[in-house]
Amino acid sequence: MKLMGLDVGSRTVGVAISDAFGWTAQGVEIIRINEDAEEFGIDRVAELVEELDAGGFVLGLPKNMNNTLGPRAEAAQHYGELLTARFHLPVDFEDERLTTVEAERMLVEEANTSRKKRKKVIDKLAASLILQNYLDRHGKLTQE
């Protein structure tokens, strides 16, 4: 079963997909959203679920460094509730502390990417890292 990884922010959602075996994750795209206007990009997610044959979701859960949940983690959980209501597919969460920092480091140090280009791909790369970390630990969706 392919899993869709999502890095949910206040303005964008980075999207990644696993291979059918649950071994690797690759970035797909970045969906523009507007939390304030309650535009969450769910219709585009629906198109991608169908197009990519996703059977479940893994969302990044941005915990605080002391392991507590703050406003961004609550927003991610709310997004998970929206996905569950719309798709009736399993949703699980992966601790995403520092994944965006890691993505930024990879783009600067390893790919020597310009700041303008980084802004265009960082959320997609973060979604890939979140999903890959999940796959490396679990190999499959644990919340079925």
Swiss-Prot record:
The keyword Hydrolase applies. It holds the Pfam family RuvX. GO terms for biological process: rRNA 5'-end processing. Gene3D superfamilies: YqgF/RNase H-like domain. GO terms for cellular component: cytosol. It is an enzyme of class 3 (hydrolase). Its EC number is 3.1.-.-. It is found in: Cytoplasm. Keywords: Cytoplasm, Hydrolase, Nuclease, Ribosome biogenesis. GO terms for molecular function: nuclease activity. Could be a nuclease involved in processing of the 5'-end of pre-16S rRNA. NCBIfam families: RNAse_H_YqgF. Belongs to the YqgF nuclease family. This is Putative pre-16S rRNA nuclease.
